[in-house]
UniProtKB/Swiss-Prot annotation:
It comes from Mycoplasmopsis pulmonis (strain UAB CTIP). The gene is lipA. It is a lipid-anchor. This is Lipoprotein A. A lipid is attached at residue 28 (S-diacylglycerol cysteine). Pfam families: Lipoprotein_17. Residues 41-50, 75-96 have a biased composition (Polar residues). It comes from the Bacteria. Residues 51-74, 172-181 have a biased composition (Basic and acidic residues). Residues 1-27 form the signal peptide.
Amino acid sequence: MNKKYFKKYSWVLILSTSILAPMTLASCNHNVAKKEDKTQNDSSNLSNKTNKSDPNDHLKDKDKNVSQDNKDSTNKAVSNENSQTQSQKTNESSQNTKDDSSKTSNLITNQNSSSNTKSKIQENKQSQKDQNTSAVNVSALEKQTKNDENISLVNSKDTNVILKNDEKVALAKDDSKEKSKNSSNLNLKTPVENRQNKNEVKDDKKALQWWQKLNESASILESFSYDQTSLSLTFKEGMPLGLEVVLKLENLDSHEEKEISFKTTNGKVQNVLLTSSNLTSGKWKIKSFSFDKTYSHSPTIETTFDFKTNEKLKQERIEKIQKAIDKYQIKIKQNYKDKPLISKYALSNFDLNLNFKDLEIVNNSLKFDGSNLNQDLKSEKQMKITFEKVSENQANKTRKAHFKITTLDNLVFEKTLEWSYKTNKEYLDEFKNGSALWDDLQASLTSVFEKSLWHPYQLPKAKSKINTINLINDVSASFQGYDYLDDFNGSAKLKFKLQRGQEQRDITFTINGFLKVSLIDPLYKGNLRNSEFDVKASSNGYWLGQYYTAAEVFKHYSNGKSYWYATANDGNPWLEFS
């Protein structure tokens, strides 16, 4: 075979391959489309059979139809994908064919270039025609593939229409089981619906919040306040529930920065507790705050506040209470300044100056509100003052009262009151003729004896009444006995022990006003004694061979027995005349 015929034969073979390959692919796509049509017809027949079945079983059949429809839909999707894949392969094959044809043509041309220049030109023209023919075939194949895809989409839509008609027929046949079917429909959501719901949720999350729509210079914080324990932030619009907000605070003195995070509540006003923030005492301001760690904003209003730690607040509170207590004035009542015993002092002995109408003192304690003590202590409720004790310095002659003032949370403060006093010894040393204490004792004794019209010798009868006499200035006088009696003058000198507190003093005190024993027989005639008096005695004794009776005393002095003896064994001799 000569070279000329060999070249022609080669070109015929190449052209045949270029034409037959696209036709073969188109035939395959046509067969696939026929199979899909057959599948759709089977699905339609199955749906019609379902409509003719027992109405009581329509739910069960519907489940099967939905399952079958899902399978058909899946098969169609696979078929469409295969068709598209096959079309792509056809295009690639056509392109490869063109490349191979071009390579073969170039190879043959190069081999025969040395023999015939004219043949080479003709061959190039023929190659250009073949390429144009191949491009036309590829374009026809692509159009055929698009037509197949359109037919597949139309068939899919027809299938969906048939399914919807089936559902309407089932609803019309069994209205009594509508709720059950709705429940089944909810459980039989297609994957497409689920994907749509997920997309809606994602769209909601992607929606911008109101503060994200504002520029950085816009103000989103309307107002700000601070109450020693928390910050109150009022935003321009309401905040959603559970949004994480991070506040960045800056100390204006030390430039220290702190971050505080909190979760928002529904509404415009948000409260941020600072009790556990570990902030140091000083002036702070809100430097910025961020939402969900993505959007940051710097306030455009004044947000400076003077933060104080719990220790600082407590210290200031203690100082305020102590300052009020230092100004608080307690006074000792005048008549209690010189009490004999300091152990006998009580809270009632002091003027507390608490603006109380009725003092309810219990166990030397009194409850009151802080405002009664000082107007700066209005926040202090149920304070209490308790009397502790009184101490004294005898050398300086001063006494000091000790009080304890407590708050409701058991903060304890001390208050003292000091004053000068008069000692017990000084009071007892004042007992002398003409003093108030002297006159008081004299008046007390005189009232006893003058009212009784007693003689001095009758003082023993008064002992029970003068055993202890309470005098002024807390002084007491205890009767100790007689010093002497003066019957003729109606006077007696008595012994007493004065006492004030632990201090004592022995005194003698002469009183007058007793009935006097006058001279019965001033002329000593003695003739009136026996006739005027009845004489009685406890006993009559014997002395030196003679009896000395009481009656002998009232005889004339010349009798020689002008005195009376009692017997030796008379333990309590007495003489009575009337």
